[in-house]
Amino acid sequence: MDTRIFVGSNTPLGFQSFYGEKLKNIARVYILKGGPGTGKNTLLKKIGQEASERGLDTEYWYCSGDPLSLDGIYIKKLNIAIVDGTAPHVIDATLPAVKETVVALGDYIDEAKVRLYSETIIELAHQKSAHYKRAYKALASARKIMEAEEDLDEGIIYNDKLTQLAASLAYHIRRA
């Protein structure tokens, strides 16, 4: 059975990665390196699809910044993972050739074609960075508001009664 999860998240404290925990006990890790547009997501999707079609249970690790994109896959029976090793979840080989193999997709870029769009690429990279900064500020602000509301609620809301109400509602919903 295939599984779909996020192995990182965007939080009020910035990007939080759980890749280290996920990769700790995996026998073989292929780390994809390369900038935007080098085919990391496409390669991950194709390999994941092929593994699934062959009946291999596959864990799909989705990107917290773009939930339509993959940041990695884990093929359980083979105990191998293929991951995007670029920011914000930078992954580098700690045991090259023993446990990890770095795949430099950037080596296959047609640099002449990319240079034609260099101004656009630079502008979009700056915009992306600015949007992430704004998003993290918004998440931090939301956290402060939530904490302030919790402080206000303290002593007003009876948590045990709220828990009983939630349990009662869940019971009635299940019976309906």
Residue ranges of predicted features:
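Glycine-rich phosphate-binding P-loop
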Residues: R28-A51
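Short, low-complexity cationic-aromatic patches
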Residues: L23, T38-K40, K76
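Conserved nucleotide-sensing/catalytic segment adjacent to the nucleotide-binding pocket
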Residues: T3-P12, Q49-I121, H126
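Pre-Walker A adenine-sensing motif
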Residues: T11-L23
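Small-side-chain structural scaffolding
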Residues: L44-G48, A81, A135-A142
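Generic local-structure boundary detector
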Residues: S17, N41-L43, S69-G72, D84-T86, ...
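Conserved NTP phosphate-binding and transfer environment spanning the P-loop NTPase/kinase superfamily
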Residues: M1-N10, N25-Y30, P36, E111-A176
